[in-house]
Amino acid sequence: MPEAAVKYQPYPQIVLPDRTWPSKAITEAPIWCSVDLRDGNQALVDPMGHDRKARMFHLLLDMGFKEIEIGFPSASQTDYDFARWCVEEGNVSEDVSLQVLVQCRPELIARTFEALEGAHRPIVHFYNSTSELQRRVVFGKDVAGIKQIATDAAKMITDMAAKAGGGYRFEYSPESFTGTELEVALEICNAVIEIVRPTADNKLIINLPSTVEMATPNIYADQIEWMCRNLDNRENLIVSLHPHNDRGTGIAATELGLMAGADRVEGTLFGNGERTGNVDVVTLALNMFTQGVDPKLDCSDIERIKEVYEYSNQMVIPERHPYVGELVYTAFSGSHQDAINKGMKAIKQANKPTWEVPYLPIDPRDVGRSYEAIIRINSQSGKGGIAYILQEDYGINLPRNLQIEFREEVQRITDEEGKELPSKRIHQRFIESYVEQPGARIKFVDHHTYPAGEHKGLRVVAAEITDGGETRQIEGKGTGPIDGFINALSIYLGIELSVADYSEHSLQHGSNAAAIAYVEVEYPGGKLFGVGINTNIVAASLEAIVSAANRVLDVVGK
């Protein structure tokens, strides 16, 4: 790489020692304007045809956008025709303003008004580039010449609007604002404001675009606060942000710009746009939502938003994209899974509406996602994640020691295969290892109990089992079926077995609900779990003991 200090110059700092934005917070949603159908569309390899545009347009209306930039009708017949369709057939309610873009050229402005005929309070958005670089390299004009372009356009647009009977709104953008000296941007904007003469009933939108993101977000915030302080007739202006994402900080720049006094944001769904994209309004809205602020945009069906985005733009959303990517609500790490598992249990038990789950800043259900993909299992996963999947998907609530034991078995599989284990496979392995145990030596068949005669309080458990497929009758004594049955198995197998831990719960609800029993059996070499499932809880418990005994036999080699 070349020497950075020689080839690139740092962006100048803004002198604003009394800046106030760092102590501000976002407490209400801005005015949102979608520019998907203009800025977004112009950045596509294959620009949208009518059907793709119409589908995007209806989604934006359904989401609650009140301002939608529908195109550049003076630039192409396609955009002109779509603008007429929106006006005539778009079913646009009167609280929604259609916005169109136009350069500061007389013939383009005239065509723009033709495209908007019949629209309710549309926004005519005119712009010209004001940056020092473009003045010098592209236009060869001084500040006065660039200002003249803007003021001539402002005069023509306001005159044409008056001749058309009024009802128009106006927006002016000093394009490449972040590359323009603040004093120059202010001079040009104030000249436009003087011509448009905005009022409380018809405010002028002054859009301050980060056409190319050139510096850190705090500098953009300083620029916005400085402009908000110095613009003429500020009370009758709507200061708008239009950030891009060249440095990867478009979201942060927008949030700081709102803290600095801006009222409005132009952006696109999931940040589609030229180069690295426009600011992502979905992420912005959901960032506000997770801070307790109503974003005034409906993102409750994020899968539909994603589907329309991918259809209309012919682009795929990355798996890690905030709030919408396939993996953003998923944990593979063992420690993360354990924390999520405990957090989900805690929130179920807590009697309050506040969302508090580690590693999940938003409840996936709030955007139409389920809990199914929160935890997925691979070689990095831990006992908490495995326990969560079995609990959520199958109602199996593993005791802690069984979580540890079964995790080792799952770990062996993931290490061998080197890939993710789906929920169904984990459940299948659990049932095979602990319940069905194909090929196991001992199987439980039946049992009955009767008093132990001279031993008051004890009962004899007479049980039928199979050993290698052959029927055997065994007997043992104990205070109940579990105690007596493990005594019988100990005698029969010649291994001292005892119950170290026992728990059970129902798997379903109702009179025919199956019960699942977990029994941890201690033997001279350690402890192992067994699991039984049966509609009879006693039978489930005895099956669990047999399950554990078979695992002991595997270990001791009998």
From Swiss-Prot:
Top EC class of this enzyme: transferase
Gene3D superfamilies: 3.30.160.270, Aldolase class I
Gene Ontology, cellular component aspect: cytoplasm
Annotated metabolic or biological route of this protein: Amino-acid biosynthesis; L-leucine biosynthesis; L-leucine from 3-methyl-2-oxobutanoate: step 1/4
Residue span(s) of domain Pyruvate carboxyltransferase: 30-303
Region Regulatory domain: start-end pairs: 437-558
Keywords: Amino-acid biosynthesis, Branched-chain amino acid biosynthesis, Cytoplasm, Leucine biosynthesis, Magnesium, Metal-binding, Transferase
GO biological process assignments: L-leucine biosynthetic process
Compartment annotation: Cytoplasm
Binding-site residues for Mg(2+), renumbered to this chain: D39, H242, H244, N278
E.C. number(s) listed in UniProt: 2.3.3.13
Keyword ATP-binding appears in the UniProt entry: no
InterPro entries: 2-isopropylmalate_synth_dimer (IPR013709), AIPM/Hcit_synth_CS (IPR002034), Aldolase_TIM (IPR013785), IPM_Synthase (IPR005668), LeuA-like_post-cat (IPR054692), LeuA_allosteric_dom_sf (IPR036230), LeuA_N_DRE-TIM (IPR039371), PYR_CT (IPR000891)
Catalytic activity, reaction form: 3-methyl-2-oxobutanoate + acetyl-CoA + H2O = (2S)-2-isopropylmalate + CoA + H(+)
Cofactors demanded by this protein: Mg(2+)
Gene Ontology molecular function: 2-isopropylmalate synthase activity; acetyl-CoA C-acetyltransferase activity; magnesium ion binding
Main location: cytoplasm
Function: Catalyzes the condensation of the acetyl group of acetyl-CoA with 3-methyl-2-oxobutanoate (2-ketoisovalerate) to form 3-carboxy-3-hydroxy-4-methylpentanoate (2-isopropylmalate).
Subunit and interaction comment: Homodimer.
Name the record gives this protein: 2-isopropylmalate synthase
Lineage, highest ranks first: Bacteria, Pseudomonadati, Pseudomonadota, Alphaproteobacteria, Hyphomicrobiales
Gene (UniProt): leuA
